[in-house]
């Protein structure tokens, strides 16, 4: 009786293997890249564009890519940098690169958490992907977001979104730098992603991408 039960269970397991393999093969990735175009990134914007293109080159064959940045809204000290989609769900590397080339630095108070929440909504609006990857190229400053970090992390987990980040925090002053590092480290860790903080005056692109280790399967 035990032998028959064992054989039956073994047969059921073997029959289920093709379904498991198909499910793994059908796993789909989708990427959203946030390029921080706020004023605090002005002196680093050249390397920001290079990093964005390097990421596009690495991931575009593995799933659709969307590019997001900020637009300035309002005037003076009360102006805000609000998130906007520049191009959505394409695997055309040339088109993505041209979109990146068209970006420029704008004013306004940064809303980083709001931007991530906005990206989550836009990526979620299109069915098909089983895992969504948000990639931030930013100094990590957030000044006037209305979205709360705890609420955002909960939404991201529910939506199977992992946050990866390249934190260009070198030019921030002490207190601001510590706050930015803490925010990016927490966001990426809690969502199953990773953050890289390049050191020194020169950013080694390939070393950063290798350490970031974006999902591409």
Can you describe what each PLM-predicted range is?
Residues 1-9:
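Bacterial N-terminal signal peptides that target proteins for export
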Residues 8-18:
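Bacterial N-terminal signal peptides
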Residues 21-23:
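Boundary at the C-terminal end of the N-terminal hydrophobic targeting segment
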Residues 26-86, 112-119, 132-138:
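Von Willebrand factor
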Residues 41-44, 75-80, 142-148, 172-176, ...:
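Extracytoplasmic/secreted cell-surface and envelope-processing proteins
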Residues 64-99, 115, 121-126, 145-147, ...:
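Short beta-strand-loop
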Residues 140-186, 190:
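VWA/integrin I-like adhesion module and closely mimicked acidic/polar interface patches used
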Residues 198-217:
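C-terminal "exit" segments of structured domains
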């Amino acid at each position: 009786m035990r032998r028959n039960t064992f054989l039956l269970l073994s047969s059921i397991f073997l029959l289920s293997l093709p379904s498991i393999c198909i499910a793994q093969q059908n796993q789909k990735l989708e990427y959203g890249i946030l390029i921080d175009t706020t004023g605090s990134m002005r002196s680093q914007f050249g390397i920001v564009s290079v990093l964005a293109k390097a990421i596009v080159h690495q991931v575009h064959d593995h799933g659709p890519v969307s590019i997001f940045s900020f637009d300035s809204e309002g005037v003076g000290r009360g102006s805000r940098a609000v998130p906007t989609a520049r191009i959505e769900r394409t695997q055309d590397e040339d088109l993505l690169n041209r979109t990146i080339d068209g970006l420029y630095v704008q004013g306004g108070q940064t809303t980083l958490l709001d931007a991530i929440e906005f990206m989550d909504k836009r990526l979620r609006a299109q069915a098909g992907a089983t895992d969504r990857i948000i990639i931030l190229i930013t100094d990590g400053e957030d000044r006037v977001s209305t979205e709360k970090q705890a609420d955002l992390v909960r939404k991201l987990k529910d939506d199977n979104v992992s946050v990866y980040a390249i934190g260009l925090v070198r030019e921030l002053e002490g207190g601001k730098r510590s706050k930015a590092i803490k925010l990016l480290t927490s966001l990426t860790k809690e969502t199953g992603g990773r953050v890289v903080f390049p050191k020194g005056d020169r950013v080694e692109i390939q070393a950063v991408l290798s350490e970031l280790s974006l999902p591409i399967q």
